[in-house]
């Protein structure tokens, strides 16, 4: 394989709220590449000017960045300009998928099931605004979930059980972004679907210790339970795969990625979000799903790299 003679930049760290997770993912990926005999170097984009990659003879980039400037199309557009092949989706799919509001609009235009929501911009937000929209918000019903539009890893998210706490929840979300979503909180079972190339890996059902799959449940807790196989019957699994692939193809996702879905108590699926650069930590779902498919972490990293374009 010619891949062995190449020089791979593992882009990690960065400046987003998810920097720490990116560092863990990135160094896991780096160590795996080195074990495979691949010449790879860790590049923290917080300190390293990306435009220097060609001058240092890097031939490909493995993007292990999460959040803004790494998962939002920014780094992808620079790498494309530099003519350096990179892992994951291209610029536009990355920019769309990190923006939950625009992703929802796109999916809705194809009649896919998205969780009912309201979108609010920071410049129009105040207590009077919430009063004005109280009827719209009440149509969602309590509880509701307030989240920044462009943050991952459940950062800045609050579950609101009473209207008295809604203003504070919105203020918290606005710390992290200039626009937020207020969504209907769906009680049910969450599923994550990993996609490698054009293949769907085994589906995982997520059962957090508490009601919500938050940052602690994702990265720190050992009490979150994962079921893979998911326990869905064949018909529901086929339905979920169809919805997922359609959603992924609509945003033009390529390489590898993950789509998160929740099934309510009436057995209806609702799309949550798409992730074009999933985590690769010890707690991460993508390598967990790959392992169930018989793909080791080391082989998985190689396969993702081979899909770089």
Swiss-Prot record:
Single annotated GO MF: D-alanine-D-alanine ligase activity
Catalytic activity: 2 D-alanine + ATP = D-alanyl-D-alanine + ADP + phosphate + H(+)
Xref: Pfam families: Dala_Dala_lig_C, Dala_Dala_lig_N
One GO BP annotation of this record: cell wall organization
Keywords: ATP-binding, Cell shape, Cell wall biogenesis/degradation, Cytoplasm, Ligase, Magnesium, Manganese, Metal-binding, Nucleotide-binding, Peptidoglycan synthesis
Function statement: Cell wall formation.
Protein name per the record: D-alanine--D-alanine ligase
Lineage: Bacteria, Pseudomonadati, Pseudomonadota, Gammaproteobacteria, Enterobacterales
């Amino acid at each position: 394989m010619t891949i062995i003679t190449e020089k791979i930049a593992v882009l990690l760290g960065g400046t987003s709220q998810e920097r720490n997770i990116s560092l863990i993912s990135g160094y896991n990926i780096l160590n795996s590449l080195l074990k495979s005999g691949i010449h790879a170097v860790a590049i923290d984009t917080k300190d390293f000017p990306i435009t220097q990659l060609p001058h240092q003879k890097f031939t490909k980039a493995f993007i292990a960045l999460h959040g803004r400037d790494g998962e939002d199309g920014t780094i992808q557009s620079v790498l494309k300009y530099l003519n350096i092949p990179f892992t994951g989706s291209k610029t536009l799919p990355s920019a769309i998928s990190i923006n939950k509001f625009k992703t929802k609009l796109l999916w809705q235009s194809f009649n896919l099931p998205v969780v009912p929501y309201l979108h609010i911009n920071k410049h129009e937000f105040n207590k009077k605004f919430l009063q004005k929209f109280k009827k719209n918000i009440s149509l969602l019903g309590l509880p509701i979930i307030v989240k920044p539009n462009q943050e991952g890893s459940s950062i800045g998210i609050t579950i609101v059980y009473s209207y008295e706490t809604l203003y504070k929840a919105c203020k918290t979300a606005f710390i992290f972004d200039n626009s937020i979503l207020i969504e209907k909180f769906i009680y049910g079972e969450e599923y994550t679907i990993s996609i490698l190339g054009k293949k769907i890996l085994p589906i995982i059902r997520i059962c957090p210790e508490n009601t919500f799959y938050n940052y602690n449940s994702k990265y720190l807790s050992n009490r979150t339970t994962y079921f893979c196989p998911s326990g869905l019957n064949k018909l529901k699994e086929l339905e979920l795969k169809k919805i997922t692939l359609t959603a992924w193809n609509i945003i033009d996702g390529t390489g590898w990625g993950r789509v998160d879905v929740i099934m309510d108590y009436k057995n209806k699926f609702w799309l949550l979000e798409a992730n074009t650069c999933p985590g690769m930590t010890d707690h991460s779902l993508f390598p967990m799903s790959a392992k169930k498919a018989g793909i080791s972490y080391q082989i998985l990293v190689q396969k993702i790299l081979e899909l770089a374009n």
